[in-house]
From Swiss-Prot:
DNA-binding region: 173-192
Record domain Response regulatory: where: 3-120
Protein's gene: agmR
Keyword tags: Activator, DNA-binding, Glycerol metabolism, Phosphoprotein, Transcription, Transcription regulation
Gene3D superfamilies per record: 3.40.50.2300
HTH luxR-type domain sequence ranges: 149-214
Annotated positions of the 4-aspartylphosphate modification: D55
Protein name: Glycerol metabolism activator
UniProt cross-references to Pfam families, sorted A to Z: GerE (PF00196), Response_reg (PF00072)
Alphabetized InterPro entries for the sequence: CheY-like_superfamily, RcsB_transcriptional_reg, Sig_transdc_resp-reg_C-effctor, Sig_transdc_resp-reg_receiver, Tscrpt_reg_LuxR_C
Function field: Positive activator for glycerol metabolism. Regulates the expression of qedA in a positive manner and governs the expression of ADH I and ADH IIB. General regulator of quinoprotein ethanol oxidation and affects expression of ADH IIG activity but is not the sole regulator.
GO molecular function annotations of the record: DNA binding
GO biological process: glycerol metabolic process; phosphorelay signal transduction system; regulation of DNA-templated transcription
Length: 221
């Protein structure tokens, strides 16, 4: 079904993620490696890989430098960072440097399976619990959101706000359609309108900028 490389220096975690893949995606071929050099070697031998699950802190990585090296050597193979890191800025940098997703090692099994499925379907996955971590503890004025001016948010319809809120929770278009009881094609149309109205180029920019919006306040309109 799929051909996936797990690059992580912890045998127990490799075994755990291996089981997630074989249970969630039967028939998939899974390869494993424990350092960046071996990962680079395997990607050179297997350019038909569908996905690389890359640990941020295994030998040879030097943080995000290893991701950059891997993307340079294998630019056509999607790479997902799988890490215990919880810093939102690191997540943002990983996406900026070419990762198509970021999965935390503390993710429940079902969430990890869903994240991998979203990525294999061509979507970008961001951990919703981290994306929404930088809310102020006090009540913020609606004009203070770091990502968007209030007039941009006010241009969104109620349904578009609901879709954007679901996007920040890490939901795929299919999940949003189910939860809002609308067609998936309608969700795609809303997402396109959201990106246009907010003047962003892609879904990731929208999600990262909208992570600390108080949707409840806007939806009271």
């Amino acid at each position: 079904m799929y051909k996936i490389l797990i690059a992580d220096d912890h045998p127990l975690f490799r075994e755990a993620i291996h089981n997630v893949i074989t249970d969630g995606f039967p028939g998939s071929e899974v390869m494993e490696t424990a350092d960046l050099d071996s990962a680079l070697s395997l990607t050179g031998q297997h350019d038909d890989l569908d996905l690389i699950l890359l640990d941020l802190n295994m030998p040879g990585m030097h943080g995000l430098g290893g991701l950059i090296n891997l993307r340079n050597e294998a630019p056509t193979i999607p790479v997902v960072i799988v890490s215990a890191e919880q810093d939102k800025q690191v997540v943002l940098q990983a996406i900026t440097y070419g990762a198509v997703g970021f999965i935390t090692k503390s993710s429940p099994r079902s969430q990890m399976t869903d994240a991998i499925e979203q990525i294999l379907n061509g979507n970008v996955y961001l951990p919703p619990d981290i994306i929404r971590t930088q809310k102020s503890t006090g009540r913020r004025n609606q004009s203070e959101h770091a990502g968007f001016a209030p007039e941009l948010l006010q241009a969104l319809t109620r349904k578009q706000l609901l879709v954007l809120e679901r996007m920040t929770k890490g939901e795929s278009n299919k999940q949003i359609a189910y939860n809002l009881d609308i067609a998936e094609t309608t969700v795609k149309a809303h997402v396109s309108a959201i990106l246009r109205k907010l003047n962003v180029h892609n879904r990731v920019q929208a999600i990262l900028s909208a992570g600390d919006i108080d949707f409840t306040a806007y939806l009271r309109r």
